[in-house]
Amino acid sequence: LFREETGFPLWEYRRIFAQSNYQTPVTTGDITLMNWPQNDYFLGNVYDVSSQEKEKHLYQAKQLSLSLFYWLQTEAPRPDGGKGYPGLKLRPDVLGTKNGLAKAAYIRESRRIKAEYTIVEQDVSPDFNEAGTGKFYDDRVGIGSYSIDLHPSMAGRTYLDIKALPFHIPLGALIPKDMDNLLAGCKNIGTTHITNGCYR
């Protein structure tokens, strides 16, 4: 959980405020966002289902996040042999909600457009690009750098993290086929399931 412990420091991974960056004492403490594989909810869909089914899954997703948070407060093993970090607390003041959870569920993978160009793994993989960057697009409109990060799925496939090179964002991936006057953005651009893991 933390840098002084073994493993990957999840606390720092999504930290949005580090008290150590300020000379003046700050009483809020560090602030991190809990968007980790441990609170990924994949027991149902919120698209193409009834309103009742959607609300059920959104509720259960909140319960999963609250359960993980409770475990962190009360049972997470500490380096000193103790259990839990009772000083952790939800921050309604930061997120603008009554319960301290996000205002909306994070949908990790949305529907994607059928784009004029679809970015494939070979475009970003070091196995197919020798220049130290991903494929060079003449119509590039942006840049990015993130590994291909796929979380567990409803089919039970486990977490996957594959190295990807720094990459460009081609305009063709933002333009849908067969539709005028629309540009896609974020996780619905022309990617595959694999490359969607790094284009965010």
Regions found by a protein language model. Give the residues of each.
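Flavin (FAD/FMN)-binding glycine-rich loop and adjacent Rossmann-like elements that form
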Residues: 1-198
